[in-house]
Amino acid sequence: MATATLTIDLDAIAANWRALDQMTASDCQTGAVVKADSYGLGAAKVAHALARAGARRFFVATCEEGADVRRALGSGPQICVFSGHMEGDTALIRDFDLTPMLNSIDQLTRHFEALGGQPFGLQLDSGMNRLGLEPGEWEAVAGFALEAGPELLMSHLACSDDPDHPMNAEQLGAFRAMTDGTGVPRSLSATGGILLGPAWHFELTRPGIGLYGGRPFENARPVVRLSLPVIQVREVEIGEPVGYSNTWTAEHTSTIATVAAGYADGLPRTLSSRATLYAGRVPCPLVGRVSMDLITVDVSHLPEVPETLDILGPHQTPDDLADTAGTIGYEILTSLGRRYQRRYGALAA
């Protein structure tokens, strides 16, 4: 079979959620971010696993994502939508009982006129300049917005992956200035904010990347293994090139495995002649260019060529691969292609 297998450990995701939950006080609720199809790992199954672990609030990017998660979970858990109440979202918000995080005065007006009485939250801009009501806007609308009974006041940290960055304290101060005394539950922290400490936790945290094994949660359990099938093996003589543009040439007689995955499957071309795959625990260098559907790997040192080689797993996390590619683990995870066969179960040692 020429289809790669992406193994996703739901128990590890649940364990990561519990570990992050235990870092906060008992009166602080821990939500879960399942946007972008749970960072590419399958929101329906991931949300079920997190609900079993105890999560009761889920966060998605769009109302369409929220509808998918509601179909998977049924009634009960709250599903919050970061993009708020966009034009055309009214029916989805109503029919799937979604809670939009309203980001602007236009969105407040739209929501109150179309769905007065429907739950909502408010996103405030504490300095990231991306989404949310700015301090001046919030001052103008806070009175009637709070009177309408928001479920949550939230903001988002720009630099929480760097605990020493001064922006963290600046945003904390700005958020408190806008929300102290409101009596409404507050949320400022995703994974990085949880790790900053209790001052950033408030009444609700909303971890995302930490659930899926990513930085900055260094103690996270590995969540994914990506095993790529070997299609063909050949002997390459000294001086013979491999792959497009002859970017790699054999310096000695080499055994080269051609493996079924490429940039169409989310493996960036920047991995060309830089990445490492694994046969069990044995590293094998990627040689030549990453092409659309194929990569080539030097397996000369293996006593026997296996049926598959791993590019993600316990020996190489998405963050490790991202370092090699010059990107971030988020991008590696969310780019994992549709051609992979997704399997849910424990990661083999």
UniProtKB/Swiss-Prot annotation:
Binding site for substrate: 130, 292
Recorded metabolic or biological pathway in which this protein acts: Amino-acid biosynthesis; D-alanine biosynthesis; D-alanine from L-alanine: step 1/1
One of the protein's GO biological processes: D-alanine biosynthetic process
Matching InterPro entries: Ala_racemase, Ala_racemase/Decarboxylase_C, Ala_racemase_C, Ala_racemase_N, PLP-binding_barrel
Catalytic activity: L-alanine = D-alanine
Keywords: Isomerase, Pyridoxal phosphate
Catalytic residue positions: 35 (proton acceptor), 244 (proton acceptor)
Top-level lineage group: Bacteria
Keyword set includes Isomerase: yes
Modified residues annotated as N6-(pyridoxal phosphate)lysine in this record: 35
Class of the enzyme per the UniProt entry, highest EC level: isomerase
PANTHER family from the UniProt entry: ALANINE RACEMASE (PTHR30511), ALANINE RACEMASE, CATABOLIC-RELATED (PTHR30511:SF0)
Entry-linked HAMAP family: Ala_racemase
Identification of the protein by name: Alanine racemase
Protein's organism: Cereibacter sphaeroides (strain ATCC 17023 / DSM 158 / JCM 6121 / CCUG 31486 / LMG 2827 / NBRC 12203 / NCIMB 8253 / ATH 2.4.1.) (Rhodobacter sphaeroides)
